[in-house]
């Protein structure tokens, strides 16, 4: 496979009304990697931005690296291709450069029975959000009876048929990734494991494990965000290092990941932030800087997905 661009634009939480313009700004700023997902419910608008810049002649499709993700209600093998085609249709693309299993957990599909007509599935997938999180009377997700090893076989078929160039996973712990890598008859290894990663959740052990197995790591939420009064951007250590390098705190947080050989996908719809976030290749953090940032680790996970904690494949019950 070709290398995944080191910095990409995450389209998570980018409202449909603003993400098209954000994609245009990003391409002009030098971004070539765009991280999408069915669950973000904005793929149509992301695709509009991509097509605009291609038509304009600013970029070619083959210059771009477009990733999307399989949602949890479509883990049954017979639904994987339909879900992938849905994302391709929304993006108006012929292929994806990367397709990920969004979470290792399969949910009950949007129909009471596993067998679903194409028209029913088409309706569910064209009304995003309606059936994404099937809940029981306790407001916990209703699991499906799938196994991600079976889902992976359908993901591999997408590569064979040319719908996607590469496949990977997201939010897998090391035991789940090891189980996948040891799968009998494995045709394609996951090229990356996309995980939450920032200085308050450095993921040192999981990154080491993935890289030792030849699986790259992609960091989502690299700027941390705010949770329970904690805002990583305002951390005194990050602020000090930023001042020393005459860079923004966000640039320090992004550079921190690239120096760990971790792909990083910050998200923003603000043009100035989009441009700033990719300007991280003209300076280098010292080893002292890196050690100080690593020392901030507090195992603070922001994306805990609590309504799935009872699922057999919930990934965060173990240390890494």
UniProtKB/Swiss-Prot annotation:
InterPro entries: AKR (IPR020471), AKR1E2 (IPR044484), Aldo/ket_reductase_CS (IPR018170), NADP_OxRdtase_dom (IPR023210), NADP_OxRdtase_dom_sf (IPR036812)
EC category: oxidoreductase
Keyword Acyltransferase listed: no
Record has Oxidoreductase as a keyword: yes
PROSITE patterns: ALDOKETO_REDUCTASE_2
Binding site for substrate: 102
Principal place of residence: cytoplasm
Pfam families named in the record: Aldo_ket_red (PF00248)
Classification via SUPFAM superfamilies: NAD(P)-linked oxidoreductase
Site (Lowers pKa of active site Tyr): 69
Alphabetized UniProt keyword annotations: Cytoplasm, NADP, Oxidoreductase
Functional note: Catalyzes the NADPH-dependent reduction of 1,5-anhydro-D-fructose (AF) to 1,5-anhydro-D-glucitol.
Protein name (Swiss-Prot/TrEMBL): 1,5-anhydro-D-fructose reductase
Organism encoding this protein: Macaca fascicularis (Crab-eating macaque)
Underlying gene: AKR1E2
